Amino acid sequence: MITSRLLVYVAVLVLCVIKVSSRDTFIAAVYEHAVKLPNATLVPVSHEEALAVMNQNLDLLEAAITSAANQGAHIIVTPEDGIYGWNFSRETIYPYLEDIPDPGVNWIPCNNPKRFGYTPVQERLSCLAKDNSIYVVANIGDKKPCNASDSQCPLDGRYQYNTDVVFDSQGKLVARYHKHNLFMGENQFNVPKKPEIVTFDTIFGRFGVFTCFDILFYDPAVTLVKDFHVDTIVFPTAWMNVLPHLSAIQFHSAWAMGMGVNFLASNIHHPSKRMTGSGIYAPDSPRAFHYDMKTKEGKLLLSQLDSYTHHPIVVNWTSYASGIKAFPTENQEFTGTAFFDEFTFLELTRVTGNYTVCQKKLCCHLSYKMSEKRTDEVYALGAFDGLHVVEGRYYLQICTLLKCKTAHVHTCGGAVETASTRFDMFSLSGTFGTQYVFPEVLLSETQLAPGEFQVSSDGRLFSMKPLSGPLLTVTLFGRIYEKDQTLKASSDPRSQVPGVMLLVIIPIVCSLSW
């Protein structure tokens, strides 16, 4: 009897400990950082000069981290390139790099800074996490020596990686991620030999890590959610906004909803390069977001999130659209270009209506009602089903309702930032050939519409009430990863030409060297 009671007592005690040591909610912080850039140079600076630049940025990050901790935050995410900027060649970034060990070494740099050589940046980040009892996510550069025994070893005898690091609330290094999908112009870094799947567990859920351009590809982004069941993504980024479908807050919030996870996106603040847009996004709606092209200051965001995301019901993205007939119309289809992709469009000529437009295997259906039909603004329903080939190769299926740049239909698909037309109702669906579809709603002045729309299990994106502001776009952004035929960047700098970049008309997202 005593033994039986003791076992029951122990079992109850264990359950209590588990309950006490986990949290149902947590407070997340992201910091949009106005990075201090070093002077452009064709020759490497000294380690001391590089550290001086990095410490200027770390001073600003310290203020944000301390403020977040004082407001109760459990974790803070800071941007890609936030400690030294992006204007580098392979040689000139070298003084800014540190050797970042595998987290399995069980290391608190704040307590033992010389264990892995000279690591002042890791030491300072570790101390900021430890002194403020907060998880800190940051982006720095890693260097790894290699030799002739490695057939892929670069000629300069080292690999250089765009790297995210995570320090826990004790200052311990708990995660290291080498960015896999480098964006054009990141010639200063190597591509890891295979995608790294990086997670870390906390008392407020399981987290996954990836960086900027990674979000457009299956590995590691989708794998982290589908196979490793993370609750929250931490996402350092240097994202350049591209309308109509790839502004930062628009696409990142859509990815959170489409994948059913929390998403903590920290962007650089550099309006002259269209870099702004950070947010804390839950699966059902944005919790906090920031988009500011007018000022030069950074911004700290905080919000409470559920620790363990309950993945929403599975959406059959083609169920509704494939079960209805195409809406008849007398309007003439026309083509227009959105970020180099040729869409098939139909103009919305009435204040209310139903339209269908198709391209290849994708048919998009729209029902809508405007508050009024203005003569100075034109809206169109568009479809794109094809391989995007500019600044990356990725297969897209997109259904979009968008405002055209002018009152002439030939401008449909161009970037638009303001609108005057409000919509009382919309319902958008498509015959998608993928389960990976990301729902976007973007209002005038590049603002989100939290709580004003939702997705049904049969694949409709629809409004729940009249929108609170004039509409820029309503979009279902689909990805068919297996059709990508992605051209991987070489991990061997012998195939790279330092300082030479592919030039295109419009720079898109992530970490450019100019």
UniProtKB/Swiss-Prot annotation:
It is found in: Cell membrane. The active site is at E80, K179, C212. Residues 40-307 form the CN hydrolase domain. Its EC number is 3.5.1.92. Residues 1-22 form the signal peptide. Pfam families: CN_hydrolase, Vanin_C. A lipid is attached at D492 (GPI-anchor amidated aspartate). InterPro entries: Biotinidase-like_euk, Biotinidase/VNN, C-N_Hydrolase, C-N_Hydrolase_sf, Vanin_C. GO terms for molecular function: pantetheine hydrolase activity. Belongs to the carbon-nitrogen hydrolase superfamily. BTD/VNN family. It is a lipid-anchor; GPI-anchor. It catalyses: (R)-pantetheine + H2O = cysteamine + (R)-pantothenate. Keywords: Cell membrane, Glycoprotein, GPI-anchor, Hydrolase, Lipoprotein, Membrane, Signal. This is Pantetheinase. CDD domains: biotinidase_like. Its main location: membrane. Monomer. PROSITE patterns: CN_HYDROLASE (PS50263). The lineage of its organism: Eukaryota, Metazoa, Chordata, Craniata, Vertebrata.
